[in-house]
């Protein structure tokens, strides 16, 4: 007994169940074969992807077909919630794996291409390794040229003397001896 249902895009035989979903931005058709545990997804743009599961997954699955319209133009498959969730999880995992594999391949290809281009066309220029070692040498050179403790102490002693001299001129007061000096301010001792 082979019954055919007319779908939005194509014909589906009775031995194959399918789900038609209308999302906000696109339509998705899920086609599942009863003989195998594979699932194919056909998007609105015509791109299809597939996912396969184990035999236990197939046995646990309940599929009920319902006709939406009386004339039989469209149909939907209603899965148990857990089955839908597993279907989407499997699809997401597969997409993530494919993406990570393609990114790994791309990055390794890019690195090898960069090395080859540096080796063949830039023989007069510094390579990445040479640049890194030059920067490390500069850092090491700066570390060896650090001032000693006595030089640092002398620097701050001189700065402190200059600051005291500045206050002495500005406020006409000797802060070391704590005595007023002659100048624009007149100091009065408080009792």
UniProtKB/Swiss-Prot annotation:
Disruption phenotype: No visible phenotype.
Keywords per UniProt: Cell cycle, Nucleus, Protein kinase inhibitor, Ubl conjugation
Tissue: Expressed at low levels in roots, stems, leaves and flowers.
Domain of life the protein comes from: Eukaryota
Keyword flag tRNA processing: no
Main localization category: nucleus
PTM statement from Swiss-Prot or TrEMBL: Ubiquitinated independently by RKP and SCF (SKP1-CUL1-FBL5/SKP2B) protein ligase complex, leading to proteasomal degradation.
Function: Binds and inhibits CYCD2-1/CDKA-1 kinase complex activity. Regulates cell division which is crucial for plant growth, development and morphogenesis. Functions in turning cells from a mitotic to an endoreplicating cell cycle mode. Acts cell- and non-cell-autonomously to regulate endoreduplication by allowing S phase progression, but blocking entry into mitosis. Keeps on the one hand the plant cell cycle locally controlled, and on the other hand provides a possibility of linking cell cycle control in single cells with the supracellular organization of a tissue or an organ.
Additional information: Plants overexpressing ICK1/KRP1 show altered morphology (including flowers) with a reduction in plant size, cell numbers, pollen germination, seed production and CDK kinase activity. Trichome cells misexpressing ICK1/KRP1 show reduced endoreduplication and cell size, and undergo cell death. ICK1/KRP1 degradation is regulated by the AXR1-dependent RUB conjugation pathway that is required for the function of the SCF complexes.
Record-given protein name: Cyclin-dependent kinase inhibitor 1
Organism for this UniProt entry: Arabidopsis thaliana
Phylogenetic classification of the source organism: Eukaryota, Viridiplantae, Streptophyta, Embryophyta, Tracheophyta
Gene name, Swiss-Prot/TrEMBL: KRP1
């Amino acid at each position: 007994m082979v019954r055919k249902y007319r779908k939005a895009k194509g014909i589906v035989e009775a031995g194959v169940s399918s789900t038609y979903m209308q999302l906000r931005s696109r339509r998705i058709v899920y086609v599942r074969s009863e003989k195998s545990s594979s699932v194919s997804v056909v998007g609105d743009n015509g791109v299809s992807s597939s996912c396969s599961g184990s035999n236990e997954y197939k046995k646990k699955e309940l599929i009920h077909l319902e006709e939406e319209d009386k004339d039989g133009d469209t149909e939907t498959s209603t899965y148990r919630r857990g089955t839908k969730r597993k279907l989407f999880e499997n699809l997401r995992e597969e997409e993530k794996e494919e993406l990570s594999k393609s990114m790994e391949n791309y990055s390794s290809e890019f690195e090898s291409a960069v090395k080859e281009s540096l080796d063949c066309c830039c023989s007069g220029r510094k390579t990445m390794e040479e640049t890194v070692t030059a920067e490390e040498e500069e850092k090491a050179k700066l570390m060896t040229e650090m001032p000693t403790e006595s030089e640092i102490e002398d620097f701050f002693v001189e700065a402190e003397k200059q600051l005291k001299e500045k206050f002495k001129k500005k406020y006409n007061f000797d802060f070391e001896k704590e005595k007023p000096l002659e100048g624009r301010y007149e100091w009065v001792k408080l009792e």
